[in-house]
Amino acid sequence: MPTKLERAEQNVETRSESLKKPLGLFDLVLTQILFVVGSSWVGAAAKLGQAHLFFWLLAILLFYIPQAAVVIYLSNRMPLEGGIYQWAKLGFNEFAGFIVAWNLWLLSITVIALGGMFITTNISYAIGPGAAWMPDSKWCVALISAALVGGLGWACVRGLSLGKWVHNIGAFAMFVVYAALIFLPLLGLARGELKTYQPLQLALPTMSIFYCFNIFSKLSVGALSGFEYVAILAGETRAPARDIGRSVLIASPVIALMFILGTSSVLAFVGNSPIDLIGPVPQTLRLGLQSFPIAGAVAAIGILLMTTRTIASTSVHVTGSSRLPMVAGWDRLLPNWFSRLHPRYKTPVNSIIFVGATTLLIAIASQIGAGIQEAFQLVDNAANVFYGIVYFTMFAIPIFGAGAIRSGASIWLRIVAICGAAVSLSAIFFTIYPIIDVPSRLSFAVKIIAVTGIANAIGVAIFLVGRKRRRG
């Protein structure tokens, strides 16, 4: 006789049978790399100087490896559509599953809403000084945001048979940029423009311990995160129990090398000069190729390729954030409207429309007035708290979860899960209590706590209403 856990898993698998399954191992690997690797973090890490390698290695040891290990374990144990929603629901209870999915959904909504602003900025950089007005133009940002959300929403409705190629092309564009970035110091050495280049030089940090922990938590939960997101699409993967874990194993070392060597390249050319934290990659490309007549053109191409990556990465957010309401609808915690599939493409079309409308409304509203802009900035700052909550819950499953799930977790997996949970808590703390200059640390902390509390109170209210409606 099947256990309660097995019946719950079978119910999700039965629901997932209606979904198309276009994702293979190749697609998953590229999506993992696309989603995790960004361009801004190599600039942030380069500000640490030669100590960047120390921080990268520490973050890899205490967060990146634990994250990969736990995601592999849970995706093998529960290869279910909805990913971490199902893991927390079956590992703890429905409330935990809903709240962790709610926090992840809030994070994605924030990222999608910001996408238009980032793309507008990148396009203005690619065009040159004549387009410097674009990021400051509310109408321009609003129009580009509308085009982004509309285009990605259409692709998402069409399904991952199309969407996976958006993600694959974005990953390829990023590979081209990072290959150029990593190769640049070698070219500089060959031409005599760089005297030395030591990409793997290990130096201990000289800044305060408090500052070190802050940077470490940011690199961990900010840069080296995202493996759990692809698992949301398990029901649309041909062999999820096998391939999601494999994709993490294959992508992990590639991602680590891209971050470490990319940071080394930025440091080699920018050095002690001010680092452009928005566009450290094009800044480095310009400096590395300044002796070539085509330096400006190459940098512009690099910016456009990174813009392609941003669009593709935002597409992953749209896809994942539309699946979370769908699976909550399966459990009748949200109206069944969110779970209805497109008759041809078998995608949650209503959920996609809801995500698109919500993010577009936020993106446009954030351009209207200073009060709304400040509120959105607070939500953006609180996004790290949302992600910290997601990761703390995920790491807790092999430690404190249901016996049927944690029974297969080895001692070493539980130890690394404890490390990951501790880092997640530190990321929450350093988001609430920043070491950067703010007018009032207490006021900043109170605002972040208030935003996080209100956001999660809304999530709790939605859960309670959904459960009451289901019982009635």
Outline where the language-model segments fall:
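Membrane-interface "cap" regions at the ends of multi-pass membrane proteins
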Residues: 1-58, 64-69, 78-81, 460, ...
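A generic transmembrane alpha-helix motif of multi-pass inner-membrane proteins
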Residues: 56, 377, 382-387, 411-472
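Hydrophobic transmembrane alpha-helices that form the core helical bundles
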Residues: 46-48, 65-149, 154-157, 307-324, ...
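Helix-loop-helix connectors at the membrane interface of multi-pass transporters/channels
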Residues: 4, 15, 86-89, 116-143, ...
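TM-loop-TM module centered on a large, flexible mid-protein loop between adjacent transmembrane helices
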Residues: 86-88, 93, 125-130, 247-315, ...
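Membrane-interface loop-to-helix entry segments
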Residues: 140-194, 225, 248-253, 384-393, ...
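Helix-loop-helix junctions that connect adjacent transmembrane segments
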Residues: 19, 53-54, 131-140, 168-300, ...
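Select transmembrane alpha-helical segments in multipass membrane proteins
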Residues: 21-32, 93-106, 144-148, 206-220, ...
